[in-house]
């Protein structure tokens, strides 16, 4: 530790600009009558996604001598959907999320997330609204849009929905990724590798890029597209090589959602990962009735970094992980 390690990594000027942008975001939703909510940062259940790693703690207060396991939330999604099912109407949240993963230029274990849900919207309507928010905060032009399939065909010349693993690995070889790709047996992991290395740096350079209709196997909590069951009603947003957001036309079928959670846990066990506790409160909320809606999660630290022309999230956050 040096004598200056107590100092914030962002300048006071940048922190003031950050506060201004957060105020603009809140005004954006207030003008649209979207309610701001707060949900727990800790939960008894957590995500089952094989790509997400959580922080775990334990409550040992009165009545819990043996301890009660808790997870810091990777997203407020599950709690917010319970509010939607309870009749909250359209809602948003600006708050902290936690992921026990990377720390670096675009990652901090504790970060600020904006998540919102719009009743009566599908993912295309939500993309329209997000486009308006991005133009406000980033002062950029309207976003370009492409399907996941179009992104692969236009940039890599390969169809992600139809090509065999052999062809996908050949594309990986042209990108210098043979050592990683050749032993890979999971199709989605290989597709994600090709997307992150081969496509992300080449889209959304002038204006943000919306990529939608991801493979059904990557649906997560999104509906399967009724017109093309090969794809899910899911989108992601990229700008200047950085992933900003992930959105869904939200799945409202409790049986299907529970089956996906269980399939995730089965895959976790196959991979030698810990099985995660399923959120049965969410399943009960879906059984009670989730209104037709779309939702999206947006990384605020990355958004503000881009808005202020910085190249590292440490320059727009006060105390990142090394100084926390």
Curated annotation (Swiss-Prot):
PANTHER family the UniProt entry points to: ELONGATION FACTOR P--(R)-BETA-LYSINE LIGASE, LYSYL-TRNA SYNTHETASE
Coiled-coil parts of chain: none
TM segment ranges: none
Annotated binding of ATP, by residue: 99-101, 108, 243-244, 299
UniProt function note: With EpmB is involved in the beta-lysylation step of the post-translational modification of translation elongation factor P (EF-P). Catalyzes the ATP-dependent activation of (R)-beta-lysine produced by EpmB, forming a lysyl-adenylate, from which the beta-lysyl moiety is then transferred to the epsilon-amino group of a conserved specific lysine residue in EF-P.
Enzyme class: ligase
Superkingdom of origin organism: Bacteria
InterPro entries: Aa-tRNA-synt_II, aa-tRNA-synth_II, aa-tRNA-synth_II/BPL/LPL, EpmA, Lys-tRNA-synth_II_C
Protein family membership: Belongs to the class-II aminoacyl-tRNA synthetase family. EpmA subfamily.
Binding site for substrate: 75-77, 117, 250
The protein, known as: Elongation factor P--(R)-beta-lysine ligase
Record-listed E.C. numbers: 6.3.2.-
Disulfide bonds: none
Catalysed transformations (reactions): D-beta-lysine + L-lysyl-[protein] + ATP = N(6)-((3R)-3,6-diaminohexanoyl)-L-lysyl-[protein] + AMP + diphosphate + H(+)
Species annotation: Vibrio cholerae serotype O1 (strain ATCC 39315 / El Tor Inaba N16961)
Keywords: ATP-binding, Ligase, Nucleotide-binding
A GO term, aspect molecular function: lysine-tRNA ligase activity
Pfam families in UniProt: tRNA-synt_2
GO biological process: lysyl-tRNA aminoacylation
Subunit structure: Homodimer.
SUPFAM superfamilies noted in UniProt: Class II aaRS and biotin synthetases
Any one Gene Ontology cellular component term annotated for this protein: cytoplasm
